[in-house]
């Protein structure tokens, strides 16, 4: 089952595995939102958009529509 950044719950960490290059802003790539890097979901806005993440020691708010385009794999400690 494919997991996306948008499906993480608050506090969960995951490794970025893939993304749709055409849907990701260049600024996110420059900040380290790349395959192999660990991302953590810090907060979700009251209406569910945007979401607040940390990646590569940077805190970033991104739209849910962008987060859906980023595939992740949950870190072992968060798997049930």
Predicted region positions:
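Compact, glycine-rich, soluble single-domain proteins
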Residues: 1-80
């Amino acid at each position: 089952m494919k997991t996306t950044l948008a499906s993480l719950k608050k506090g969960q960490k995951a490794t970025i595995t893939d993304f749709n290059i055409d849907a990701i802003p260049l600024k996110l790539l420059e900040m380290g939102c790349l395959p192999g890097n660990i991302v953590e979901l810090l907060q979700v806005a009251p209406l569910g958009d945007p979401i607040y993440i940390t990646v590569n020691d940077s805190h970033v708010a991104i739209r849910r529509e962008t987060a859906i385009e980023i595939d992740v794999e949950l870190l072992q400690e968060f798997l049930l």
